[in-house]
Amino acid sequence: MGIKRQSETLTYSAQTVGGKDVNDIKSINMINSLQGKSAGLQITPNSTGAGGSSKILFRGNKSISGSNQPLIVIDGVPTMTNTATSQVASDYGGERDAGDVMSTINPDDIASITLLKGAAASALYGAVAANGAIMITTKQGMAGKVKVNVSSNTTMEVPMILPEFQDTYGAGADGTFSWGDKLSKASKNYAESFFRTGFTTNNTVSLSGGSENFKGYFSYGNVFSHGMTPENTYRSHNLNTKVDFKVLNNVYVDFSAKYSTQYSKNQAAAGYLWNPLTGVYLAPRGIDWDYYKDNYEVYDPARGCNVQNWTNTELQQFGNPYWMLNRQTPISKRNRYEFGGSIKWDITADLNIQGRMRYERGEEQFIHNAYASSVGNLYKMGRMKNNRYFSDQLYGDVLINYNHTWNDWGLTATAGSSFTKTKTAHVDLWGEGEQYKSPGDGNIYYPNIFTPNNFYGNLSKLGKGDAMETEKRLNAVFATAQVAFKEAVFLDLSARNDWSSALAFTDGCSFFYPSVGASVLLNKLVPMGEQVNLFKFRGSYSIVGNDVPIYMSNQRYTLKESGVISAPDEAPFRTLKPEKTHSIEVGFDGTFFNNRLDFSLTYYKTNTKNQFFSVSAPYESGLRNRYVNAGNVQNQGIEASIGWHQQFNPDFSWSTNFNISYNENKIKELVEGLENGLTIASWQGAKVVLNEGGSYGDLYVRQIKRDEAGKPVKNDKGEPILMGDNVDEMKYAGNMNAKVNFGWTNTFHYKDFTFSFLIDGKFGGRVLSATEATLDGWGVSKRSGIARNAGKVVVDGVEFDPQAWYTTTGSSNFNNSYATEFYVYKGTNVRLREMSLGYTFRNLFGNGKNLTAALIARNLFFFYKDAPCDPDVSMGTGNGVQGVDVFNLPSATSLGLNLKLNF
């Protein structure tokens, strides 16, 4: 909010990291560079590669139906999270990942990042910050001569982990599954042949300078990436300008403008459909891989066009990967514009008033045309898809700030008002069908012509066009005050009231929430000696609302392309109340031995109430669902960090920091009438189910039938018998969220050399791999090959034929569920996340003109893991889908060089 305070006066936990933490070893999505560097911060990258989004979580999942992502604040102003929703998490496959705001930020523009993990810390930002806030401060011009900084970060990427395949048994008679006879020679490893060495370069040039009355900052950055998947490219460009004026002695004006553009081609998409990895991993062993690579299409005289060439072109989840990359290529183009400004008037030395405004616009075009014969024969004449997404946000606020001291007393106060106006829109163009012969018989004139004019009736009779606009407004008033005594005791009070248009048709469209906090610097009240620099206790209590989605409180009718108005199937939620998170936090901060040792410890407990649920409506209402407010999700845990800096001599120093967090989640209440709990995510034979007394992320899996002695039971064919996939027949397999996360950073300086590394990990949680289940079901896994060599699979003393076992317990068809109990793994893992070795060439190009060169590496190796995939990568950023592997793009090990030049 533009409010500045000394860290030692804060009554809540807040951690600030420098810009070097995200730009020394860069990630294309800069938030991923913070993995393992802060207690209580969990970052899960999506499995879509460059330009993809990431799930960010502070202190556990709180909202069942709403968002759990924190607010992103840039230079004090809340920002839009993304252009549109990110990739839909489904085992069938999500076609797009719209990215997030973090992927549009140039890490070289960042001066610092402050992590506000608790509700008390972010209460002034209102409902949008119910899950905490990430405050990013960007660089600005400094008075003095113009300074130029140039940086270039170049890395090469290779897959960190690949599945293990058998190379002994080939295809059966259908040319699909690898349950055939032994091969005369070992099969090629198609995955090793398919993936290439990726290449990414990230470059920035910036200029800053000015005088006392005018300061300016300008930067240009770009990213060029050729992914590990063939034909995958990503590029982005960023422009950033900030200027500050001193108009009068007491009037200050600043203006900023930013523009970013992103282009991605063949971005990875987890799931079965639209994913080249299904063909790479499932291709029958022993085929001529190079033949299908060079001849991925053949001419079909009946359709008059080239069609897919593959061992079996009828299966939708199984295609030639090179056809997918060249003939059903997803292309995404994104633009983001941002303009902002502020004016501040220092009325007196103690009193000022400021006004700020920022406008943001996001645009995306997503093109995913599929040539004839794509996805089996689902699109016999091809499919056209051209979607456009738009979002706008206008934010403004006015704040009055007062700061004064009287002898031992001090008062800092802020009061203000803000408004946020958000609009979204999307226009979808989609067409597919059969070859046109006459009116009423077919609708596509020519295959693979992706224009509306190629469709009979210009798509109007297909009903495939779609358009939607939304608008939301949020107005607020707020105030905060801090009273200080002897610069040692601090009391914070804050309050905010929001008016949300999403609640317009309810009894009350506003909601109020307060917070209170206190901190005591005991070292300033009681003599503790020179070795104690800070000895601080703090505590806070807050209530923060979480706004609700639009159009829940009013019936919404839909106008179809044909002119027909369709009635809603959900009852309006006229008694809707926003979620509210009640949070308590206590902690200790200390620094000792001339600030060489620092220690921080925090305990927190949150209860998020008034959750909103969709439940079945009474039959006589004629509606399908209705909404209710209910539920209480509790999170409580501990965060701790300890750091030490040792200066051994003028040339040699060592700095180390260790952080660890523990979070325990508990569902205290749910809506009545849910006998089998609430399912928030499901896959083939696996469900994430919430139950009272359980935890957010509880995983239930399908199991095989066993006798009273616990031994597997066979059917007449000698196959294991699957139990049902209703929750009451499923098996609890654990919780998908780790309770403990940690990170350990070390930095050594010797003269002009710098060496650093980061080890991080987590303990607990579960990972579900549909990839491994499918490899087993198709007979291509190393595990299935070993079993066939042995001639049997032995499970708890019962022998099975390998094919009978794996085609039943594994996945041989993505429409069928399987025994997921055998494909759940421990999420515990410890890895060497980052490492860097650099040298600074001082005064290389003149006095003060230095060059720093560093060898950098990321995701080098695991010290320990149980899962066959990277446990920290997920197929989506939605609720309940972390830790799921459905042919996800492998994580990358990157090695490279980082250069920085200043003059």
Q: Which role does the model predict for each range below?
A:
Residues 167-186, 273-323, 368-382, 425-464, ...:
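Surface-exposed loop/turn segments flanking beta-strands in extracellular/periplasmic regions
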